[in-house]
Structure formats: structure tokens, C-alpha cells
Amino acid sequence: MALQSPGATGASSSVSRLLSSAKLSSTKTIFSVDFVRSYCISKGTKRRNELSGFRGYSPLLKSSLRSPFSVKAILNSDRAAGDASSSFSDLKPQVAYLEDIISERGACGVGFIANLENKATHKIVNDALIALGCMEHRGGCGSDNTSGDGSGLMTSIPWDLFNEWAEKQGIASFDRTHTGVGMLFLPRDDNIRKEAKKVITSIFEKEGLEVLGWRDVPVEASIVGHNAKQTMPNTEQVFVRIVKDDKVDDVERELYICRKLIERAVASESWASELYFSSLSNQTIVYKGMLRSEVLGLFYPDLQNDLYKSPFAIYHRRFSTNTSPRWHLAQPMRFLGHNGEINTIQGNLNWMTSREASLRSPVWHGRENDIRPISNPKASDSANLDSAAELLIRSGRTPEESLMILVPEAYKNHPTLMIKYPEAVDFYDYYKGQMEPWDGPALVLFSDGKTVGACLDRNGLRPARYWRTSDNVVYVASEVGVLPMDESKVTMKGRLGPGMMISVDLENGQVYENTEVKKRVASYNPYGKWVSENLRNLKPSNYLSSAILETDETLRRQQAFGYSSEDVQMVIESMAAQGKEPTFCMGDDTPVAVLSQKPHMLYDYFKQRFAQVTNPAIDPLREGLVMSLEVNIGKRGNILEVGPQNVSQVVLSGPVLNERELEGLLGDPLLKSQILPTFFDIRRGIEGSLKKGLLKLCEAADEAVRNGSQVLVLSDRSDNPEPTRPAIPMLLAVGAVHQHLIQNGLRMSASIIADTAQCFSTHHFACLIGYGASAICPHLALETCRQWRLSNKTVNMMRNGKMPTVTMEQAQKNYRKAVNTGLLKVLSKMGISLFSSYCGAQIFEIYGLGNEVVEFSFRGSASQIGGLTLDELARETLTFWVRAFSEDTAKRLENFGFIQFRPGGEYHGNNPEMSKLLHKAVREKSETAYAVYQQHLANRPITVFRDLLEFKSDRNPIPVGKVEPASSIVERFCTGGMSLGAISRETHETIAIAMNRLGGKSNSGEGGEDPIRWKPLTDVVDGYSSTLPHLKGLRNGDTATSAIKQVASGRFGVTPTFLVNADQLEIKVAQGAKPGEGGQLPGKKVSAYIARLRNSKPGVPLISPPPHHDIYSIEDLAQLIFDLHQVNPKAKVSVKLVSETGIGTVASGVAKANADIIQISGYDGGTGASPISSIKHAGGPWELGLAETQKTLIGNGLRERVIIRVDGGFKSGVDVLIAAAMGADEYGFGTLAMIATGCIMARICHTNNCPVGVASQREELRARFPGLPGDLVNFFLYIAEEVRGILAQLGYEKLDDIIGRTDLLKARDISLVKTHLDLSYLLSSVGLPKRSSTSIRKQEVHSNGPVLDDTLLQDPEIMDAIENEKTVHKTMSIYNVDRSVCGRIAGVIAKKYGDTGFAGQLNLTFTGSAGQSFACFLTPGMNIRLVGEANDYVGKGMAGGEVVILPVESTGFRPEDATIVGNTCLYGATGGLLFVRGKAGERFAVRNSLAQAVVEGTGDHCCEYMTGGCVVILGKVGRNVAAGMTGGLAYILDEDNTLLPKMNKEIVKIQRVTSPVGQTQLKSLIQAHVEKTGSSKGAMIVEEWDKYLAMFWQLVPPSEEDTPEANSDHILKTTTGDEEQVSSTLAEK
């Protein structure tokens, strides 16, 4: 039976009926429950089979917090409340461990309703329940299909309901001013619950509060899902009277203190996690649980009671990637409802812990210690953000001010911000050095009971729509259409853009939009005065103009600090010459540092983490306006105190300092900088020496800070380096001091600067920053730049024109520029925008360092396999140091061969000998030659973690004849996703033909596929075919189609026909060799053939963004999976991830999002081009990722739901069997498949000069391609036979029988050169799936369940029109739960007629609010009209047809002022027309290829990455217009002359519309827009054409300059006067 997807809904007829009745019937809550149930389960369809469970192997916190407030102490102590305070030293700072943080990730659907008259009604609560139910598809469910990931409501306290209860209990009516209400989850055990309540009562009484009573909250337990019921708490309410405070804020503070004391009192108890305050307040209350949206109101009968009234409600539906039933993580939290993910959370938690010691405020009257700890590393990111906001609000900040501090907008590089509200810029500048942003996708709803509001993250990565009605109600929601609405009463429709906020003042009945909110908050204090008088900017200083060391001394120091000739030549000198990071290819096939037999720098044991699925990466090149490397140096003030003293800091434009700039900081009298040498003494032996040196350094740092130093400069600079005093690895030193200061409450008092010789690559800088350094002076790297510039070789090459001439100053500037650019890329991989959020965030994982090292310097980072001790690390450090001081010191740097293969250098898995042996075996079809190849692999050095494992068996060997045939095994083999463009057509098609012969699967990669490949060959003669004349070795019956067709971020070639001709569809989220990055196919590789497949022009660079712009969260991924299942219900959908710590949690979410296949790629996968630092330092080994994924999925009950595929460096049958034993069902080969078809590992893929035509588009090189399909067939058959042989030795007949059997693996008895590793993580097991691998692989494609398209396709007239190419007209209602509407119809048409062959006309009119992905993947002949509004992703992937969207006629707003469609419209569209009467959200026409559109205003990033088509915008646009736009044209009406500052001018030029052809194109599109939509704005423009034509700008990329529509003679050359005119106009406004 097929499994259903998230949000599977029935036909819309029942919805229509219910919506109609909703407007007329009473508003009793019981109706809303029925409505929602019908909405989501109509026609008896089953609930969707989203699955989840628990992750039971997360380690506990390394140190638990035991407080004097233990339960025993509380119950037996009579001491006064005033004595119940502990000092900061009693509260050991809690470390944020990565394993805890990544165990919970999520996303959601959220919204609020607020009555401006502050009128409490039950209708508000009822409407919130309805809206919540209409976003059920944005939430997740457990493996039992009924346990929701969480839903809840926050409202004001329903005093009428509680007073009725009080009266029945004989309790006097509650004094609303002085009564607090606690909503608690309590232990289920009766005795423990009694004990818990005693503790709570005791603390309340000791604090002077009177407990008025306890109320058992009525619940309907029978409707709770099985999983959730296992941990369902007892839910009670406690009512307390506060007698000593009159002000609301004081009452709330007292309740806050009580709650914190209670939490600390029970923290050390075994049942502590079972006690949780959902809320404890005098103003608000939260009802929530592990429930689906539609049952929240049923579970809590209170919510159905007419006496439950509130003037506002915040509602929240959660989608957690890892849902063991944890009731307290449901939302809303106590203040916030959060949709998104905080990707800086580890750093945020560490910094919050650091600042606890400095927290002081008069409002606490000396009780600050009683509210610590503020954060909880074991809670979710949302819970910790809520705790941070709660601290600020309870300390006197308003909710709006608190959120502006925590989630600031991108106020730098904002063209109009200084004009609109300069005081807000001062506010942000003030707090920039006080609080690191909580960065990541975030729609945050908030309320303290007096105000309710919402704010959006700086990048606008979550949808947020709002509207207001004439009866003074304001609505905000993740989607429009969540409530039945009389459109005639709607007076305003809008959306929150990036960094924007909306706030409703309930007490004064006012709505404040973004600018008003920011101005009001910024006016509280004279921030501008404080900033201007106290914040100092470090002025850039000139670089040194000559070398300061002799050449021999420079060489000696380079040797001492671990430099190799590759590091100097390929990294430092390349950066100095070109000003950018060097690019390489083919992935990393060398051993990781701990397995290497050569010494490595400490940095090499760290891998950068990256964003995938739960939050997006950022494009640092095209969206750099939201990023900044600015850093504040100096003491951070007390965040609870506001005043000028907090900004006595120095601002650096970036973290890389030259020597003179460091001197300037050292000379600043206010900073009181202290230089701390970082050397350790080995004169008494190596044992313990490094640890002693670190302890001495930490003590010196401690003393310096306590003596007032605000800057600690850790320096390994020495005039005379000594052989017996080696330098402590700077990363180790920085981490140790950072951790020491945190543990001692001193971290906020000083910045750390590294003055180091051992830092030259981007990765080194990133590591130092990530573990606490605010700035780095790379003195030896700068000296190396100077020596390079002065060398005779460089001088001669410049003189001879072999390299550009650069000055000494420019060489060093280039180097710093390259580092800064690389750092932005590192930040962006994780989706982090600001340096301040990355600093100290520890966004790395460690491979090969033991617990001693990690706990000393890198506490909280994941190191799953152990590794080097401090003494072993000291020995490795000394390997470099001793060489530098030996008598026979080399006269040149050694080439370790870490990057390029060289004899005698580091071992490379893909070495020339291996390639030759493999070529011989497959070309000669020689078993003997393959045996030699096998022996070569068996004799290689330990290279990857699986090399440390070997097989053991519980059975006797069997004859190989009893083992399943090779033909069955090869069906599990796949090739990697290599794009046609990165590799040649010959290579791509040869691989596909070979895999089809075998019954395996090839992967198209990005870039589409030629339809000629989809049909079997019938014209083969002597191995050649006129259909594919460039190939050889063919047979009749061969097909060159790729069974797996990839959907990557650029969506190149993704058309409806491409999708419907796939057996599987792969969503490529990340790539092993460069996770978190996008790609760019250089124009020189875009031939006419490639351009045709990608719907572009030859020679035009084609950019693939780092993220999918329709995947910013897990529920977005679920939507894309839904889209693909919609258009091709027969294709399994796979999601490609890259191994990293936490992948199990992500994989759990992917399985719940209804994926059929999860692919895990290792770091050692190949690439056509990538920065060296990415190839070497990002991504993890698949062995660890596979182990984590298998355990998590089994633990969560999800394993049977998905196929697990793994790839990365596979070379043999041994690799296949180890992967199988660890849980993989299918196995991918990339690099080896290319080698088998002819690749010689020249490693110049990125140059387009591949000598054998494997990775080149040059015809003369492609002609040299030697590969035959039979070669690859031979390779895979040899692999399969090898698998059979090993299975026979193990005594197993089928591969099925060993999948997941880690008990068949053991650690090899082998000694590593450097240390020993703990492989228990790889070998441990949590059980096996309940079904066999074959059963899982053969299960049906997961289903979307009944959808609106199914109903339409059952209409005889529609089917007749499709079958016989007729014309049909249909009209029907649509609702937000109707998603991807028309996608399935488009798939049916595309399968029958292709992308352009349908001659009929389907004219479908919808009325209402369309769900996500409306009109996706349309084909020509589909004409779709929507009267109403739509959510995100309208026209996604459309190849033709027409979409018209306009609001209903009887509205209370002007359409051109209203947001009518959501974000990311026309993503990847390859044709068709879109007309929108109204405004769109962010990223309109992103990656549009050929569609034409007219819209009346857009948000930020419109026309981003466009490669074709035409877009007309008749209104205002946001920032960053046309970033990455390499093709197509755009026309933008600029009535107020504000466009120029919003333009991204990197590629496009901007001109007035002077070409007659361009004018005709523009006018005809506007006329069509008026005709289709009735647009009054468009009609006015056409009527006064000459007037408005002069206001239009035409955006022209280079590829369009010679087209008739764009006359290059009139390109605007922006002058100073033009810019002044624009600035003047902005100032007037």
C-alpha cells in the first residue's frame, strides 16, 4: 500500500460546503473542530503517514547542575527566601554540546489573531483553532501517524472560565491584577507528582506568594497518539496570589523568579524533565501538547468552552525533524512562537552562558543569581530564543525591543534605511557589540499579553502574510486562506519582508508597522550620541612595504609551523596574486588527518559544518548585502544595563589584521591590551608539557582580564624561536583561553586576538574565529606574501607578462581580500550572515581528537571517534618544530602532497597506479587484472575509516554458487549525479547506457536531459548509431536515459516532461565535495547543446544558488517532495544529503517529509570545481553519517519507510559490503565510474581542458573520449562478483541478510601511527528494520493522498479535452490546503504530449486562496485563472500556459498596494505567462529561464539568477534587484526614482527603454496584463504611455545587449550627479 504524504487532503467539495457554512453558522468551537477534521480527513481518507520517534543515544550533559535548591533542601529547609540565593560560582556554566543541540530541529506553521479593541471573545480562540487546522500540512506527525509533533495556543488568561471553576471550588473570584496562573506539565506518577507540587508550593510560599488552588486541566486522552501517550504528562494549573507588588511588570518578575527557583530546585532529580511550566503569568496562558492541529481543541475541552475568551491568540503547529514525544517542546513557548531554525544556536548558548556573570539590573533587587541559568542546552533552539527574550522582557525591555536586539534586521548596505529611520541604525550599531544575533530562518510571533506582534529574520526566509479587517481585527499567518473571510471587510493585505516587524498594541488599540515600531523603540535612548562618542573605528593601515625576515629565516619558520610547498604556492601565493581562493577539482581522496602517516596541522582535524534542509545556505556573492565581517573589539557590557559605557569598543571592518593595525590596537589606552606568548617548554620532556603550557596560558589570561585588560593577544611571534620552546598550536591556545574565561565568568570582559604564524588558509581563520578569536594577524602568511612579491621568479613572470603586475601593497591586500571572501563563504555555508554570530559558535566537528583535547579547548564540539591526547598532539606539533631546527634543515619546503598526487607524498586513493590497474581490468575484461586491482586496494595505507573494519561471521562459508546472482546485486548500484556540462556528453551518455544495461541507475546531475535519450536505440550497426553518432560500443536496445533525474538548486532543464520521464527524482540538497555551496557552469562550457538543454544561450554563465530557494526548512522540503510526487506519482523521490554530525536528525525529518530515498554522501565525493578549502575541510565521512542515520531512523520507527543510499569514494566490493552491514540498501559510485569509462585523474576538470574529453566541452578533446559502455558494465559486474565472494565466505546467500548487521563487523587489529580510535560508534546497533531491504526497495512510491487534481482528472470533460486536445472551461473553489494544484494535470499532459505538443486548451478558474505551488509545472495549453490570492511558489517550473491572479472585486484595499502572491514565484520556469494584479513577495522570478510576467510590485531579490524570459514590474521593488541575472530582460517602473540604489550591478546594466522593439515588448505585456486582470494601474500606464515610459528602466545582462529589445548605445552610465539626484529624492521622501 502506498504511504500518504504530509497534508494529504480530500476533494474540495466538502471544504467548500464547510467554508460556506462557516460564514453563517454560530462560532461554537465544536464546529471548528469538525471543520478542521473535515478539512484534513474528508472522504474518509487516512491520516498521512508521517513518522517519527526518538533519538535515544544523545549523551547527557557532561556536567549536571546541582543547586542548593534541591527538592530535599526545599522541603526540609526553613530558611527565608532572602537567603535562598547562590553566588555565580555555585552555578557552573552549562556547556552547549553539539549532540544535544542537533537532536531537535524543526519548522512550523504559525499565526496570530488580535482584536484592536482589546475585546476578549471566544471567536478569537475559535478562529485560531480553525486557522491552526488549516496549517496541518505544515506540521509533522510521529511514526504512529497520530502523534503530532506539537501544536498549541497562547491567549490571555480566560478569567471567566477560571472564576466559574473557582466558584465551584469555594474559592473567591480571582483578583486579576494580583493573580498568577501556571500551566504545568507534571509527572504522571502520583507520588512523584505530589512531591513536585510540594516543591512548587514551598517555593511560592517562601517567596511570599499564596497558593490559591490547583486545577486538573480537563483533557480527552483517548485522542492522543500512541507515541505521545507514552510520555503524556499530567496537566494542571496552579493559581497564586502576589501580595507585595502592584505593577504588572513587577508581578511578572516575581512569577519569573519563582519559576526559575523551581526549575533549579528539581534540576538534579530524575523526574526533572517531567516538570515543565508551559506558562506562569498574570497576563498569558499557553495550551499545547504533542498533538495534531485538529485535535488540540478536542484534547483541551477548555478551548471549546464559550467562557474561554481572549482578545488575541497565537497559534503554532510544529514540524520537528526528530520527534520523540516531548510535550514541552510544542509551541508557543512562554513568549514566542517560532517558525524556523536558529543555526547559530551553539554560539548563542555559549555567549549567553558567558554573559550570565555580568547580568545586573536594578529591577531584580539583587536577585540576579536566582534567575540563572538563563538558557538550557538540552532544550530546542526555539525554547532558548524564548528564554533569551524572556530575560530581556522581564528586565524591562518591551517585546519589540527585545526582538530587535536578538533578531536584528540587515541594516548595513540598506539603500533607504538611513532615510527612513536613521535612529534605528544607531540602535543596531549600539547593540551589535553587545548581543550576537540569533541568526537563521525565523518568523517569530510574540506577546506579553499587552502587545502581540511578529518579526521576520534578516533574510526573509519564512513566509509571513498579514491582513486587517474593517471590524478591527489583525491577522498574521504563515499562509493566507487559513480562515474563511469576507473579502469586502479586508482593508489591508501585506507581508513581512526581510527584517520587518508588525506590532499590535492591545492596550491602546494601535497597529504599528515596521518603520513605526523601529522608530519608537530606537527613541527610548540617545543611541546615536552614545555610538558617536564611544564607538571607535580602526582605520586601515598600510601594509609593510618590505620583508622583515631573511629568506632562510622565513623558510625555517614556515617549516616550524607546518607549511608545505603546496600551501605556499597553491594557497598563499595564489591568493596574493589573484585575490581569491584557489579552485581545484575531483574531491579529497587523501586520508583524514588522524589516519594520515604524515604530520598535520591541528586545523586539519576539524571539518566545517554546513546547512542542509532545516535551514538554507546563503549566496555570499549575490546576497552579500545581508552579510558582514565587522567585529567589535573590547569588553561587552551588561546586556541588562543601557548606557554609553557599553559601546566603548573598537570596530574592525573585518577580522584579518596586518601588523600595523595590530600595533594600533595594542596602543589603544582604553583597551589595555595584554600580549600572552603561546609557547610550551619541553626541556623536562614531552609528557605533560603541552598541558602545563596551556594551564599557564589560561592562568595568565585570567589574571590579565581581572586586572582590566579588554584585549588578550595570544602570540606565537618571537624574535628568536627556541628549539625547546615550541609554539602551542594557535587553535588549541585560543580554544583553551576561550573556554577558561567562559567557565570563570570572564569571557564578556575581553576579546581574544590571535597573532600567529600558523594561519594562512580560509579554514584556519574560520577555526580560530569559531573557537573564540575576534581577530587574527597572520604575520607569517603576510611575510610569505612579501617574500613572494620580492622573489626573482615573481618579478620575472610579471616582467614577461605571465602574471598580472601587483605591488607589494596589492599582494597583501589581495591576500586579505581572498581570506575575507573565503570567510564569507564559510559563514554562508551554515546560513550565517554575520561574523558576530559565527565567532565562538564552534560550528565544526572533529575527527581524530580525544576527549582530553576536546574538553580542554573545544568543549561542546562533537568528536565521535576519539583520537589524539594532548601528549600525542604535542608530538605531532614537534614533528614540524624539530625539522626546522635540525642541522640538516631542508633548503626548500617539503611537498606533502596533500592536494596533488606526487610520488612519495601523501597517499591518494585515486592514484595513477590504481587507475591503470582498473583500466586494464575493465578494458581487457580480465578477472586476473581485477584481482591485481583488488590486491592493490588491500595493500593500500589506511585511508578511510572503513579501512579500520573487517568482517567476522557467525556462519560457515558456503559455495559462491548459492549466493544471489550478480545481476541482482548490480540493481543496487547507482552512479553519482554528474551534470552534463561539468562532464562531456560522451561520458554522460556512456555511463547512462551502461547502467541501463545492468539494471542499475545513472543520475542526470543538474542540467536536464535530451529527449532523444529516452527511447531505445534501434539503429545500431557495428557498435555505432546515427541517433548517438558520437558514441561507440553500442547495442540495439540500449537507452541513454538517466533513471535518476536530478532537481538541483538551479533547476536547469527541469521541465514537466523531464520530470515525468524519470524513474526516480533526486533533490540534491548538498554535494560531498562542497556542501553548503552552489555552483557555476562557466560560459566557456555552455555550448549550444548545453544551452538548449538548460533553456539558455551559448556562452552565458549559469549559476546554481547555494540553497534551493523553495527549501528553507523541513516543511519546505516536504512541499517540494509533494510537488514532485504530484507531477510524477510513479517516481520515487530521493533527497541527497552530505554526512555531518546531526545528519540522523535531518534524515528523520526527511523521512517524515515523505521522501522515498535518503542518500548520504561522504566528503570524498568528486566535483568539477570547488575551492580547495571546501574540498579539504567540509563534509564528513559517510561511515559516521550512515551509522547515525541508521540508528536514528530505527530509533524513530522510520527505517522501513525509506531506502538508504550511500556514496563517496566507493572502490570495491568490500566498500559495498561494509556499507550494507552498516545499514545501506543501495550504493553509489562516482569517481570510479568515470575512471572506468576513461578518466585518467588529470585533475584539471575545472579548466575545460580534460585531455581525454571526460570533463570538457571542447569538441577536439571530446573526440578523444576512450570509454565504452561495456567497460563500466565490466567494472560493476566485477564489483558484484567480489560482493558474492565475500558473502559466500561469510556464509550468507543474499545481500539482504547482512544489511544493518554491524555485528558482522569488527575493528581490525592494527596500529595507527598517531593514536588509537574508538570505533564503537560505527559498530553499535539499535536493532534492525522490521522488513527486509528488498521489501523496502520494492515498496510503492509514497503517495500524496487524494488531491484536488485527482478530482479534476476524474471530470469526463477535462479528460476528454486532454485525450483529444479539445477546449474546456471549468470553475471551482480552492483553499490553502489545496497544494500543487494543476501539477498532476500537467504531468499527465507532459507524459502524453511532451513540453510543447498539447494543442488543446484547459481553461480552469479557481476562486479563493490557493495553497503552495499553485500552477506548478504547467504545460502549454493550460490557462489558469485565480480570483483571490495565492501562497508561495506560484508557477514553479512552469513550461508554458498562462496564469492570471487577481483579487476579488469587492475588496476594501487597492490591489496594487496588496500582496496577492507569496515568495519565490516562477522558480525555474521555462516558459509561459504570469499576470498578477497586486504585489509579490521575495525572489520573484528567481532562476526564471523563459517565462514572461507582469506584477505590480515585489520584495527583495527579484529576477535573481534569471537566464531568460521577461519580467515587467509596475511598482516598487525591494533590494538586490537582478543579482546573478545572466539572461533575460526586466522592465521596472520607477515612479519615485528609488530603483538605482536597490540594484545589484555586478552583472546587469540599466538603461531607459529606448529601443522601439523593447518599447513594443513592454507595452504589449502591460496591455495583456490589463486585459487579463483588469488592472487599474496598468490601464493608467497605457493611457498615459509617454509619461510612464520615461519612468521605466530596462535591466540588461551582457547576453542581451545585442538583442533588438535592448540598444546598447543607450546604456546608462551612472554619474555622480545621478547618484546625488537619487539621494536627494530619497531624502525628500
UniProtKB/Swiss-Prot annotation:
CDD domains: gltB_C, GltS, GltS_FMN. GO terms for biological process: L-glutamate biosynthetic process. One of its GO terms (molecular function) is metal ion binding. Its EC number is 1.4.7.1. PROSITE patterns: GATASE_TYPE_2. The active site is at residue 108. It catalyses: 2 oxidized [2Fe-2S]-[ferredoxin] + 2 L-glutamate = L-glutamine + 2 reduced [2Fe-2S]-[ferredoxin] + 2-oxoglutarate + 2 H(+). Keywords: 3Fe-4S, Amino-acid biosynthesis, Chloroplast, FAD, Flavoprotein, FMN, Glutamate biosynthesis, Glutamine amidotransferase, Iron, Iron-sulfur, Metal-binding, Oxidoreductase, Plastid, Transit peptide. SUPFAM superfamilies: Alpha subunit of glutamate synthase, C-terminal domain, FMN-linked oxidoreductases, N-terminal nucleophile aminohydrolases (Ntn hydrolases). Its cofactor is [3Fe-4S] cluster; FAD; FMN. Residues 108-507 form the Glutamine amidotransferase type-2 domain. It comes from the Eukaryota. Binds 1 [3Fe-4S] cluster. Pfam families: GATase_2, Glu_syn_central, Glu_synthase, GXGXG. [3Fe-4S] cluster binds at residues 1239, 1245, 1250. GO terms for cellular component: chloroplast; chloroplast envelope; chloroplast stroma; plastid. It is an enzyme of class 1 (oxidoreductase). Disruption phenotype: No visible phenotype. The glutamate and glutamine levels were unaffected. Belongs to the glutamate synthase family. This is Ferredoxin-dependent glutamate synthase 2, chloroplastic. It comes from Arabidopsis thaliana (Mouse-ear cress). The lineage of its organism: Eukaryota, Viridiplantae, Streptophyta, Embryophyta, Tracheophyta.
